Structure formats: structure tokens, C-alpha cells
Regions:
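Membrane helix-loop-helix hairpins that form the core translocation module of multi-pass transporters
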Residues: 32-81
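Juxtamembrane boundary at the C-terminal end of a transmembrane helix
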Residues: 163-173
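Transmembrane alpha-helical segments of multi-pass membrane transport proteins and ion-pumping complexes
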Residues: 10-18, 43-51, 74-84, 108, ...
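Alpha-helical multi-pass membrane helix bundles of inner-membrane/thylakoid proteins
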Residues: 63-71, 75-106
Length: 173
């Protein structure tokens, strides 16, 4: 998996427009900031544990990339066709944890991509690949870009990139 594919994968797996749409109206910047920090910590943990996890279940990095692409594709199809329901959220800054960090931003596709990406490129490249997605999420939230059409566009882009991640895994086998 190239670093470019990992960056694009993280952007579409997180889907900044979907995250901006889920941000609480009261204080979206603070919630997105908390969520971004939480997601970064979770990505580092998933990346650091990638090799032991994959070894424990007997899965290769290429197979993990295929699984990541399939998980990303499921989220992308959901974003493309289903309007997100408002998630119940914790009060104040805690809304950045639930629902923003989990389950909106650190969805199964992001978790699998973090594991697959770190096994292939290392944790440092994984973290560097996650930062653009978090910056775009903050920009989308501050600009109020969480509209249904943009969420669907993010889903369409996600389906394309997810397919590329699956193909990357298949070609690596």
C-alpha cells in the first residue's frame, strides 16, 4: 500500500463531511478537536498492535488490506445511500468522544485500515497519513460543510478508494 493510498483511505474512511454533520451544533470545534485527538490515539494504538494482532489470528498484511477495504466499502455505501441519524451524545466536550470519535470517525474501516496500514508502512507513516483527514474534518466542521449531499459525495469517493485498497491487497497476495 502506498502512502498516498493510505492518506486517501484515511480521508474517505473518516469522511470529514459525515463527521462534520455529526458534530454537535452547540460547540462543533471543541467536539471535533476532542474527537480528532481521540482518533489519533486510537490509530496509534491500533497501529502499534497491528503485528501482534495479525500474528495472533494468522492473517497476512495483504489479507488485512482486503478486510480494511471491505469494511471501508460498507461504510461508504452507508454514507452514499443512508442519511445519518442523529447519534445520542454525551454532554459538552464529551460529545467529541461519543458519538464523534466512536462510532462516527473511528469506524471499523478506520480501525482495519490503521492495522493494515501500520503492518505495511509502519506507525509513523500511519500517523502522518491520518493527520490530513483530521485537518479536513476540522475544516469541514468549522465551515459547516456537513450537508447530506457532501456526505454522499464522501461515500462515493469512499467506495472508489475502498475498492483500490481491496485491489492493493489482492495484488499483494
Amino acid at each position: 500500500m502506498t502512502a498516498t493510498l493510505l492518506v486517501l483511505g484515511m480521508i474517505v474512511a473518516i469522511n470529514p463531511f459525515r463527521a462534520a454533520d455529526a458534530a454537535p451544533e452547540a460547540d462543533p470545534r471543541r467536539a471535533i478537536g476532542v474527537a480528532g485527538l481521540a482518533v489519533l490515539v486510537l490509530v496509534v494504538i491500533a497501529g502499534a498492535l497491528s503485528e501482534p494482532l495479525l500474528s495472533a489470528v494468522g492473517v497476512t498484511g495483504a489479507s488485512a488490506r482486503i478486510a480494511a477495504g471491505i469494511a471501508m466499502l460498507a461504510s461508504a455505501v452507508r454514507d452514499l445511500f443512508v442519511s445519518p441519524d442523529p447519534e445520542p451524545s454525551l454532554p459538552g466536550w464529551r460529545a467529541g468522544i461519543v458519538p464523534l470519535a466512536f462510532p462516527v470517525m473511528f469506524a471499523p474501516g478506520v480501525a482495519m485500515l490503521a492495522i493494515a496500514g501500520a503492518s505495511n508502512r509502519g506507525v509513523a507513516v500511519l500517523v502522518a497519513s491520518t493527520l490530513p483527514a483530521l485537518v479536513l474534518t476540522a475544516l469541514a466542521a468549522s465551515a459547516g460543510l456537513g450537508r447530506r449531499l457532501l456526505v454522499a459525495v464522501g461515500g462515493a469517493a469512499g467506495a472508489l478508494i475502498a475498492t483500490l485498497v481491496v485491489l492493493d491487497g489482492v495484488y499483494a497476495i
